[in-house]
Amino acid sequence: MARFTLPRDLYHGKGSLENLKTLTGKKAIVVVGGGSMKRNGFLDKAVDYLKEAGMEVRLFENVEPDPSVETVMKGAAAMTEFQPDWIVAMGGGSPIDAAKAMWIKYEYPDITFEEMCKVFGMPKLRRKAHFCAISSTSGTATEVTAFAVITDYEKGIKYPLADFEITPDVAIVDPDLAETMPQKLVAHTGMDAMTHAIEAYVSTANCDFTDPLALYAIKTVSYTH
């Protein structure tokens, strides 16, 4: 038996960021990285759309590349204080991965990081909040997956978090965001996308649903100049 899990809703195409207005809730916390979303005006747009949806909004900013356990704990503490019913992660893989881990800790304050790392052994989420991921790069695809990577810098180890529970409820893939990437990042994330597509096709966990997507992704990346 196999399982193929994707976000409930995947909004894509230019201008799809506007679909934040369709979310229903009272409070949203927006998790972002180093500042590109703010510099390019997308963070302000996201906040405005969430407020238009009737939500109070708070920011958790400056998630570093390869997010740390410490950042996860700080973000979870901010969520516990604010009590959002939507977690909106915006940017590349790092802020989205960090927000997934924060989400677990927010829903289960007593859980340890070691317990969070138990593969496909997480408790049920969505008791307090739902999750929306907005990607700004082409590579990680964490906006549609059941995975995240968090770094313990004291041990010098990157830990994968893996469970269908951390698959986002909503994903927004708006090319307006990706078009602001520097040329070097376009190249790096393009290789990342190609690698993930090849991995998916040769994986022992592949299935009839994943193979066509993987093959099409390989062709699309290889034909893009």
Tell where the protein language model's regions lie, with residue ranges.
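ATP/NTP phosphate-donor binding region
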Residues: 1-86
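Conserved active-site and cofactor/substrate-binding residues in soluble primary-metabolism enzymes
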Residues: 15, 37, 41, 45, ...
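Buried hydrophobic packing segments
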Residues: 75, 98-103, 197-198, 218-221
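FAD-binding core of FAD-dependent oxidoreductases
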Residues: 88-100, 136-140
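Short Gly/Thr/Asp-enriched flexible loops that form oxyanion-binding sites at enzyme active sites
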Residues: 95-108, 144
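A glycine/threonine-rich phosphate-anchoring loop and its flanking beta-alpha core
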Residues: 108-208
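Conserved small/polar residues in nucleotide/adenosyl-binding loops
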Residues: 224-225
